[in-house]
């Protein structure tokens, strides 16, 4: 349907798709996160005391993160997937994960007693990874009526709560601790232009993977 919306202020909360806007394109890289989900095993999870959707993550750069679901599955994810050239989010960033075998291997390495549990599904999706791993907020150019929040870097569940408070204060024109938070208009390093960013991303990712396998 065609139509129009009129508003006094607009918030751009576009995740990885903010790369379509030229001024944001070098603020972050678009890279995939990949997840697998096991078959339901509520009784086996109860045996090891893993209940109530407890979420866990490690401190790797190519992070492993996982939690249980309400029907007793394990949803297990891994960072460091597909890189997008020029931030273009294409078909490689949706649907079943092309890294399902790799992610499953990480799950079974951490929980060898569950190695016999089948994988029911997998999926992939893009994230917007900034140089620092921290999100950024502000106004678009000299337009105080167009605000943005981006760069959650795959850690959006917690920081997006803070981001919502920041964007609400900016949208309402408040002068409070949220509108003046350090993440607002924070200096941020740009990634190199393409193709250096794309090629360099592959090199860095491979080096980090080797380092973390050796640890």
What is the predicted role of each segment?
Residues 3-43, 47-144:
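Active-site substrate-recognition segment that forms the wall
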Residues 142-148, 152-215:
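C-terminal lid/capping helical subdomain adjacent to the catalytic/cofactor pocket in oxidative enzymes
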